[in-house]
Amino acid sequence: MLNIFSLICLNSDLYSSRFFLAKLPEAYAFLNPIVDVMPVIPLFFLLLAFVWQAAVSFR
């Protein structure tokens, strides 16, 4: 069981490091600023939930 878990963690670590080191093709280089901001977008939804609840007085 431990070997399977370590294998899964190792594989996900390899994929994530490859993901962050990947570059866009030259044809899409102008989209680099947008792609840099995209991982932060889910945090905006989390903040929006708190703002929304504050607007309705945390019912």
Curated annotation (Swiss-Prot):
<dbReference type="GO" id="GO:0015979">
    <property type="term" value="P:photosynthesis"/>
</dbReference>
<dbReference type="GO" id="GO:0009535">
    <property type="term" value="C:chloroplast thylakoid membrane"/>
</dbReference>
<dbReference type="InterPro" id="IPR037270">
    <property type="entry name" value="PSII_PsbK_sf"/>
</dbReference>
<feature type="propeptide">
    <location>
        <begin position="1"/>
        <end position="22"/>
    </location>
</feature>
<keyword id="KW-0812">Transmembrane</keyword>
<dbReference type="InterPro" id="IPR003687">
    <property type="entry name" value="PSII_PsbK"/>
</dbReference>
<keyword id="KW-0934">Plastid</keyword>
<comment type="function">
    <text>One of the components of the core complex of photosystem II (PSII). PSII is a light-driven water:plastoquinone oxidoreductase that uses light energy to abstract electrons from H(2)O, generating O(2) and a proton gradient subsequently used for ATP formation. It consists of a core antenna complex that captures photons, and an electron transfer chain that converts photonic excitation into a charge separation.</text>
</comment>
<feature type="transmembrane region" description="Helical">
    <location>
        <begin position="38"/>
        <end position="58"/>
    </location>
</feature>
<keyword id="KW-0674">Reaction center</keyword>
<keyword id="KW-0472">Membrane</keyword>
<keyword id="KW-0150">Chloroplast</keyword>
<keyword id="KW-0604">Photosystem II</keyword>
<protein>
    <recommendedName>
        <fullName>Photosystem II reaction center protein K</fullName>
    </recommendedName>
</protein>
<keyword id="KW-1133">Transmembrane helix</keyword>
<dbReference type="GO" id="GO:0009539">
    <property type="term" value="C:photosystem II reaction center"/>
</dbReference>
<keyword id="KW-0602">Photosynthesis</keyword>
<dbReference type="Pfam" id="PF02533">
    <property type="entry name" value="PsbK"/>
</dbReference>
<comment type="similarity">
    <text>Belongs to the PsbK family.</text>
</comment>
<comment type="subunit">
    <text>PSII is composed of 1 copy each of membrane proteins PsbA, PsbB, PsbC, PsbD, PsbE, PsbF, PsbH, PsbI, PsbJ, PsbK, PsbL, PsbM, PsbT, PsbX, PsbY, PsbZ, Psb30/Ycf12, at least 3 peripheral proteins of the oxygen-evolving complex and a large number of cofactors. It forms dimeric complexes.</text>
</comment>
<keyword id="KW-0793">Thylakoid</keyword>
